[in-house]
Amino acid sequence: MKQVFVDLRPWDKELAIAALESGAAGVIADSAGPVRELGRILVIAPDGDLIPGQDIHEITIGNTEDQARAMEAARTCRIIVHTPDWTIIPLENLVACGDNVIAVVSDIKEAEQALTVLEKGVSGVLVKTDDPDLVRSICRMVQSGISGQQLHRLTVTTVKPAGMGERVCVDTCSLMVDGEGMLVGNTSSGFFLVHAETLVNPYVAPRPFRVNAGGVHAYLQVPEGKTAYLADLKAGDRVMIVHGNGSCREATVGRVKIERRPLFLVEAESECQKVSIILQNAETIRLVRPDNSAVSVTSLKPGDVVLGRVESGGRHFGMAIDETIIEK
């Protein structure tokens, strides 16, 4: 996920509070002390978590020589880029060189452009403003998933009982809405969008903070393009909440429940690539249709179309790698 940093030079308590309350990734300040008094957040400062000029470098681009210097630095270290005459061209060149670029922005339009340049965008933005509401707006925009997820239509081919086993409920510290859930799959190259427990039913009250995600072995997509095993999740971990329209946001795990339950195997295809998932056999477990509505696994049948994500390559310790790996 993209990150938002806030410039607190000179010191501005209201901006610092806005950064903390909005979930900004960090701040840059002349001293870490005043920030620490308000709360815990990553601080870029001479006495902070990241030291300017050592862990991170600030570069002002005023000419082609500055741009060349920034492009070289972006290949090996994290840089904060100031562009007095803000245009998108220097950022395109920098983004093409690496994932270490934080762009200084002063309004929401600049932030949106920086985060989407070359479709990839910079890794983060440093908000330079005296308006706490602008900080909140940019944080909301980033957390709502400005880049989103490309979802695919999966045609169901098989739905059948899969015996008993341990399944995982992921309880987050966020409330999800209809159409939202998590991307989960049996393999690292195929995921189903498993719907959150937001719907009213005769059996149990809604649990909009929960996704009954599947077997302990399954992969879950988490931030930064990585995956995690459901069995490895714990309180405090960060996960991705994905909507059927492709938008996504991060959430914090509050609790993980692993219980033995009857299971279903669901198999599907997308452009000749097979994907599968093992879910609990219960009416309250749902996948997401292309119209963002939910369909229970107990009423799912071959030919039904649901949403998911299909990828190529494999995974090593959750990181995507360009390697031939056979999973089935």
Swiss-Prot record:
Signal peptide: none annotated. It is an enzyme of class 1 (oxidoreductase). Keywords: Amino-acid biosynthesis, Aromatic amino acid biosynthesis, NAD, Oxidoreductase. Its EC number is 1.4.1.24. One of its GO terms (molecular function) is 3-dehydroquinate synthase activity. InterPro entries: DHQ_synth (IPR002812). It catalyses: 2-amino-2,3,7-trideoxy-D-lyxo-hept-6-ulosonate + NAD(+) + H2O = 3-dehydroquinate + NH4(+) + NADH + H(+). It comes from the Archaea. The keyword Amino-acid biosynthesis applies. The keyword Isomerase does not apply. One of its GO terms (biological process) is aromatic amino acid family biosynthetic process. Belongs to the archaeal-type DHQ synthase family. Catalyzes the oxidative deamination and cyclization of 2-amino-3,7-dideoxy-D-threo-hept-6-ulosonic acid (ADH) to yield 3-dehydroquinate (DHQ), which is fed into the canonical shikimic pathway of aromatic amino acid biosynthesis. This is 3-dehydroquinate synthase. The gene is aroB'.
